[in-house]
């Protein structure tokens, strides 16, 4: 996991957590300059999501623990707010439930599509519909790549399947 930092380190901390398969820059590049004027902005790039690290996303709990440990070490265990988009919202919920850090505000964002341009959202929506339809209808993804990834995970973590 990598955390990117913006703004004054002594300012109130806002933690930004991106959505599934989203790069932190694509989710937050437009708001970071605005937030960094008055806040210390931390953007999390999960294991397996960052081009600067050779890592693999394992579990939500493992990643949540890493985020909490970072907040304890770098922020004294206290942040003003955490905003999570999609998958990031799940992390915000887990951190609130676990109570290992103090978070003044937790904001759960919606779908990643709500941050995209109309054209990009339309294209992503159509791609997702085609994948999800075949999964629901046939019980398999139409993409051989996705099927191979799922099969690899089944072998690696049979307790989840």
Question: Where are the regions that the model predicts?
Answer:
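Gly/Ala-rich beta-loop-alpha elbow adjacent to hydrolase catalytic centers
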Residues: 84-92
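Flexible "cap/lid" loop of the alpha/beta hydrolase fold
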Residues: 93-97, 103-135
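Active-site loop/oxyanion-hole signature of alpha/beta-hydrolase fold enzymes
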Residues: 42-81
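Conserved alpha/beta-hydrolase catalytic His-Asp/Glu region
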Residues: 116-123, 133-161
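Conserved HGGG/HGGXW glycine-rich cap/lid loop of the alpha/beta-hydrolase fold
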Residues: 2-53
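Structural signature of beta-strand start/N-cap positions in the alpha/beta core
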Residues: 13, 40, 79-81, 105
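Short beta-strand immediately N-terminal to the catalytic nucleophile in serine-hydrolase-like folds
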Residues: 82-84, 109
